[in-house]
């Protein structure tokens, strides 16, 4: 019963409802009407109800057409009632007071401001998609921010507007009059004839023509920048201003001749716009600040906003005339290029065309020739610029800082304020800071720097402590890469204590020789073995840094054990001093080879021999508890010593002793303090030196000089 009551309560089917149903249904639903014939039966009541419900839903758009204009939906139909901007006569789109549409005024104002400084204006194409969207928006009356759009896009849209004017801007009916006026013999006659023809134009056409010719004249006067003189402008925009009514039926050659005539006419109008329309054309092309574009900025907004430095708020950069403030720029050009409204009072004061051209040139310089701070990044490699709170953006300031930083780095060797230059240590400066306990294998890369820097750095590192001349650095040897104990200078990168480090390491070069360097003898490095503890290694490094340049007797043991074993430094492993002695004792316990044999097997290029016997060395180094017996001094004869081996000192050995050219200057003061910091082997050497007589101390000193020579070479 409820179904039936709902059926009775609804509208009955009639002809109007059927027409609405058929119009709104799809093709598949057209076959439904056979069900309507059997609607009297009770079986089809449900189907009829569904059809009627569907009809109500589908007929909703038809109800929208019956709504009154005062309803809420009247706003959606409002754009359809507006007149489109394009393809309309100027008499329809212009106001009652002969005012141009607001979008056309805005476009002409922007072209007047930015056109003279834009290369290829009216010639370069724009995006087709953007052009269509802008035309649709202007046709529908949508508010568009034209200041943010590219100038070329506005020029293309304006040409479309001229092309869509019925009968064209110069009126096709006056085509013969324009051509006849142009054929006058003299220029004055042509100007007078063109004035008469222009007077026959409709009022809106004449108004737009004056504004357009003024803008084109300004652009042509700045052809050095925009590459568009009056001839080029006439070629690009002339066919949109004047054509024949039946130009579509003309042949190609006829159209070409027609376009050439129009081009000559438009070019003459551009060049003589002030003579034809009077000097007051500028006052007619004036808008107040309340009219178009709302205080139009003369700055190139699109260019500035796309620039990376547009939002720069650097306080110490003085603003220039071109980029200081857009509102300030408006004060100059606004009275001249103000825009396109004749409702205000006409100004009686007239100026020449040269003044307008100069105003455009100044406008162009303010827009285009901006300060270089807008396009160039800041270059401040100096440390002061990196640490300073504000980076200098002036080009001159950045150049000054860059030059000063370069000069400071170049003249750093000549200044005495910072004697610890980092340029001497390129390998260390390029790596991060390492802990002290790490073994740096590539410390010899620091010797690859120029000789002048190293010599300067170490000669002025400690003026009061320099005991000898600094040696010329020898080329880095690959066989001595693993030495880390006897370094000539430190590899620390800590800059907090530069003066202390200089005084430590400058002594290592004060004992070195610069006159003669003995041939290199390969030896096993004195690097600490890896099983040593970290504390022991740090202690040794600290002791050696304080005793840099002093003779460590372990080097002599290294030479002796190296020559006895005949090892080569082709491998990369190293032995400590104790391990070297143990290895020698294991092979030949208590019987090392003679001095001559060791020299013969290991260094065949050594022509001069040492100044002491193997027995004396063995007794001093391997027997610390027993005193070395005094060796009689024989000058010019053979020397012998009471050693277990009974070796004799040959004349070659005597010659090697006296031909040693290593010159060392040693401070004897403070020797007692240094004795306390020596290693075990140095303590043994001290006891042996005390046992020797004054006449035999010369031999030990010569052996010390040999170690100094090796230290200097490294």
UniProtKB/Swiss-Prot annotation:
Gene that specifies this protein: Tagap
Species per Swiss-Prot/TrEMBL record: Mus musculus (Mouse)
GO molecular function, one term: guanyl-nucleotide exchange factor activity
Pfam families referenced in this protein's UniProt entry, alphabetically: RhoGAP (PF00620)
Protein name according to UniProt: T-cell activation Rho GTPase-activating protein
Residues annotated as site: Arginine finger: 123
PANTHER family: T-CELL ACTIVATION RHO GTPASE ACTIVATING PROTEIN-RELATED, T-CELL ACTIVATION RHO GTPASE-ACTIVATING PROTEIN
Span list, region Disordered: 290-357, 370-419, 451-508, 520-563, 623-650
Residue ranges constituting the Rho-GAP domain according to the UniProt record: 88-277
Keyword list, A-Z: GTPase activation, Guanine-nucleotide releasing factor, Phosphoprotein
Regions of compositional bias (Polar residues) in chain numbering: 299-311
Low complexity bias: start-end ranges: 459-471
Stated role: May function as a GTPase-activating protein. May play a role in transmission ratio distortion (TRD) in mouse, in which heterozygous males for t-locus transmit their t-carrying chromosome to 95% or more of their offspring.
Basic and acidic residues composition bias: residue spans: 492-501, 527-545
Positions of post-translational Phosphoserine modification: 398
SUPFAM superfamilies membership: GTPase activation domain, GAP
Keyword Phosphoprotein: yes
Annotated GO biological process: defense response to virus; regulation of Rho protein signal transduction; signal transduction
Tissues and organs where the protein is expressed, per its UniProt entry: Highly expressed in testis.
């Amino acid at each position: 019963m409820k179904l039936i009551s709902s059926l009775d309560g609804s509208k009955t089917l009639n002809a109007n409802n059927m027409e609405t149903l058929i119009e709104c249904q799809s093709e598949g639903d057209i076959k439904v009407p056979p069900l309507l014939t059997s609607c009297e039966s009770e079986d089809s009541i449900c189907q009829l109800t569904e059809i009627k419900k569907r009809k109500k839903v589908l007929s909703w758009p038809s109800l929208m057409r019956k709504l009154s204009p005062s309803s809420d939906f009247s706003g959606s139909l409002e754009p359809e009632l507006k007149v489109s901007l394009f393809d309309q006569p100027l008499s329809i789109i212009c106001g009652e007071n002969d005012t141009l549409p607001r979008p056309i005024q805005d476009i002409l104002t922007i072209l007047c401001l930015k056109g003279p400084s834009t290369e290829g204006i009216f010639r370069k194409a724009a995006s087709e998609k953007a052009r269509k969207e802008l035309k649709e928006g202007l046709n529908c009356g949508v508010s568009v921010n034209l200041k943010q759009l590219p100038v070329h896009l506005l020029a293309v849209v304006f040409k479309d507007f001229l092309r869509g004017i019925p009968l064209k801007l110069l009126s096709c009916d006056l085509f013969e009059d324009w051509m006849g006026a142009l054929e006058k013999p003299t220029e004055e006659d042509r100007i007078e004839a063109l004035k008469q023809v222009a007077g026959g134009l409709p009022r809106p056409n004449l108004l737009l023509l004056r504004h357009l010719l003024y803008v084109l004249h300004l652009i042509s006067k700045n052809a050095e920048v925009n590459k568009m003189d009056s001839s080029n402008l006439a070629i690009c925009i002339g066919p949109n201003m004047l054509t024949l009514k039946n130009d579509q039926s003309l042949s190609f050659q006829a159209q070409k001749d027609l376009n050439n005539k129009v081009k000559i006419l438009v070019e003459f109008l551009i060049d003589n716009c002030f003579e034809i329309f009077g000097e007051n054309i500028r006052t007619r092309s004036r808008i107040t600040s309340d009219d178009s574009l709302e205080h139009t900025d003369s700055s190139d907004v699109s260019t500035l906003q796309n620039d990376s430095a547009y939002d720069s708020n650097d306080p110490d950069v003085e603003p220039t005339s071109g980029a200081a403030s857009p509102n300030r720029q408006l004060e100059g050009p606004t009275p001249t290029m103000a825009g396109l409204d004749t409702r205000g009072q006409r100004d009686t004061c007239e100026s020449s065309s040269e003044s307008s051209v100069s105003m455009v040139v100044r406008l162009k310089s303010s827009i285009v020739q901006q300060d270089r701070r807008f396009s160039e990044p800041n270059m401040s490699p100096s440390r002061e610029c990196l640490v300073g709170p504000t980076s200098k953006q002036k080009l001159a300031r950045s150049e000054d800082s860059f030059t000063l930083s370069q000069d400071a780095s170049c003249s750093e060797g000549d200044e005495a304020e910072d004697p610890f230059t980092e340029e001497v240590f390129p390998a260390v400066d390029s790596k991060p800071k390492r802990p002290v306990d790490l073994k740096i294998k590539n410390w010899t890369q620091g010797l690859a720097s120029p000789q002048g820097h190293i010599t300067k750095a170490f000669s002025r590192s400690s003026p009061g402590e320099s005991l000898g001349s600094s040696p010329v650095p020898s080329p880095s040897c690959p066989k001595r890469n693993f030495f880390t104990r006897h370094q000539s200078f430190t590899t620390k990168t800590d800059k907090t204590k530069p003066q202390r480090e200089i005084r430590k390491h400058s002594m290592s070069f004060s004992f070195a020789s610069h006159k003669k360097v003995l041939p290199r003898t390969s030896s096993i490095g004195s690097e600490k073995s890896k099983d040593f503890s970290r504390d022991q290694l740090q202690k040794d490094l600290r002791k050696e840094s304080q005793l840099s340049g002093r003779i460590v007797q372990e080097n002599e043991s290294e030479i002796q054990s190296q020559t006895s074993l005949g090892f080569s430094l082709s491998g990369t492993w190293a032995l400590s001093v104790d391990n070297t002695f143990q290895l020698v004792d294991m092979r030949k316990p208590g019987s090392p080879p003679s001095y001559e044999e060791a020299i013969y097997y290991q260094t065949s290029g050594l022509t001069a021999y040492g100044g002491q016997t193997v027995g004396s060395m063995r007794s001093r180094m391997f027997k610390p508890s027993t005193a070395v017996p005094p060796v009689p001094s024989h000058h010019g004869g053979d020397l012998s010593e009471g050693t277990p081996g009974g070796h004799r000192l040959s004349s070659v050995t005597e010659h090697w002793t006296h031909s040693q050219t290593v010159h060392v200057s040693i401070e004897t003061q403070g020797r007692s303090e240094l004795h306390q910091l020596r290693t075990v082997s140095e303590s043994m050497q001290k006891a042996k030196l005390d046992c020797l007589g004054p006449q035999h101390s010369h031999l030990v000193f010569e052996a010390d000089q040999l170690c100094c020579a090796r230290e200097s070479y490294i």
